[in-house]
Amino acid sequence: MEQTWRWYGPNDPVSLADVRQAGATGVVTALHHIPNGEVWSVEEILKRKAIVEDAGLVWSVVESVPIHEDIKTHTGNYEQWIANYQQTLRNLAQCGIRTVCYNFMPVLDWTRTDLEYVLPDGSKALRFDQIEFAAFELHILKRPGAEADYTEEEIAQAAVRFATMSDEDKARLTRNIIAGLPGAEEGYTLDQFRKHLELYKDIDKAKLRENFAVFLKAIIPVAEEVGVRMAVHPDDPPRPILGLPRIVSTIEDMQWMVDTVNSMANGFTMCTGSYGVRADNDLVDMIKQFGPRIYFTHLRSTMREDNPKTFHEAAHLNGDVDMYEVVKAIVEEEHRRKAEGKEDLIPMRPDHGHQMLDDLKKKTNPGYSAIGRLKGLAEVRGVELAIQRAFFSR
């Protein structure tokens, strides 16, 4: 696997020098300063590429080229935003950057309720608490019809939880959910958030798939023409939330994408921490079935709790994800490609890490502190080395 590291640009508290010392050779980054929907110019792409290469690294993957909400709702200037997206892909290809991670999650990107969940060893992790999320949706957001998405027990527990929250607790929970986590390109006030949710009131799973198909049928031929590999990131968490449909959550969703636009440019990001939240997702089977289309991997693990919809981010080699079997399946896919004469490795990044050691004293991007990811990268690197030596060395 190609060892990569997500970097949020010049304002990231983790420097490119840090990235290189961590042992990564590739950088995963994006032009976050360009508004959603606008074209990434060749000039801006080359500026970022030069910064990365001057540090002795390569820009391996774009994560992400965000998709404008008009495209997801099939309203407004969606045709112009699609045309802009096509041009951005052409410009990236011209600059030699040919792997693009993206997602089609409506309104929100990845979602957590607690950004400082303290683990038994004193390090901090990200957590999604189903009851806290219900408390937000039922008692802070007050979304009409939200009760239908929860069990009677969850509704009762959410009422108790809300009653014990201080004003600061409520404000923190609201910020965590709607203000935008690292990599998310949108942040909202509560009123703005309600208005954006309203735009989806008539969009169910079938309709969102229809809108996604319009996007894919416009984008994938351009990607194929210029040699760009599109790698869709799964929903996080991989299930409907806030009354919003989610359409990249299961192996059935992956098959739908392939059936909709059957091009090798139409591929996947295997994010084990997102897909792995669902007990019914067999990660190894997903890799084996769609291996030739996996162009990027995010390797991390989560741990489901007593309420199976509640989870926290576990250490990379712990939790519900069998990281050994996952890495073995990825390495097997790389060797299959090599047998076909393809030499490209699959970029992997240690997705998220615990806030630990000296980073506990620093301001860090949630999930993206240096030391936790350094630990995760080293652990995954060790797993891969053992697999390569045991099964593939001659």
From Swiss-Prot:
It is an enzyme of class 4 (lyase). The keyword rRNA-binding does not apply. One of its GO terms (molecular function) is ferrous iron binding. GO terms for biological process: D-glucuronate catabolic process. Its cofactor is Fe(2+); Mn(2+). It comes from the Bacteria. Its EC number is 4.2.1.8. Pfam families: UxuA. It catalyses: D-mannonate = 2-dehydro-3-deoxy-D-gluconate + H2O. Pathway: Carbohydrate metabolism; pentose and glucuronate interconversion. Keywords: Iron, Lyase, Manganese. Gene3D superfamilies: Divalent-metal-dependent TIM barrel enzymes (3.20.20.150). Catalyzes the dehydration of D-mannonate. Belongs to the mannonate dehydratase family. This is Mannonate dehydratase.
